[in-house]
Amino acid sequence: MRAAIFLNGSPDSEPLIQAVAGRADLVVAADGGARYALAAGIVPDLVVGDMDSLGEDLALEVERRGASLERHPARKDMMDGHLAVLAAGERGVTAADFLCAAGGKPGAVFAVPHILLAAERIGLRSTVVTDWGRMFVIEGRSRLVEGSARDSVSIFPLSTQATGVTLEGMGYPLENADLYPGDTLGFHNELIGTEARVSVERGALLVVQETSAP
């Protein structure tokens, strides 16, 4: 089961939003992310959060139009985006595409990789989809990177140590390497064909792909 999860970052293009949300079985919005969904003509199935960014009037309006609201207190230990991930997992979602996740408040920008890691840890295969490319996190496993030759691919460790890092199908391959925070070895690699594979035996990696393809 696949979900499209709207965050409250910067808006993506309407064609991208409609294409990604159109292939989802469930559309979830984290609080103010519902605004971006509505602006693209999409009513979320579920809105999660404290509704401070969305506002009470619009929250009631989106509920009137068929969305379910999962309300949380303003004082909480998780971001609305993290709560949206958990809500999706509870509903049987196994894959999620995040929209409107890049940009926005600086603190929220740096939180996105950690939301992806939270999704990874509950078994959600997740990808941030943007007009400039994609971003995902893997922990202790491998994943294909699909795109076009010469797409830029950068990898960054999200844990104190990422061990057994292997890159196949890229211009600068790695085999069983170890990466540490503060290490820029993984910056700006590139695909040599239409797909490559990133693997890590232990630890977590953030993978950022820059491509012109949606």
Describe the residue ranges of each PLM region.
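General beta-strand structural signal in soluble alpha/beta enzymes
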Residues: F6, V28-D31, G49, E70-R71, ...
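Active-site/ligand-binding-proximal alpha/beta "capping" segment
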Residues: L83-C100, E175
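Short glycine/serine/threonine-rich phosphate/pyrophosphate-binding segments
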Residues: S13-L16, M78-H82, K105-F110
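Anionic-ligand-binding alpha/beta catalytic cores of soluble enzymes and soluble regulatory domains
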Residues: A95-L144
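N-terminal beta-strand-loop-alpha-helix module at the start
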Residues: M1-V62
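Long, charged alpha-helical interface segments
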Residues: I138-P214
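Short phosphate-binding loop-to-helix
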Residues: L69-E90
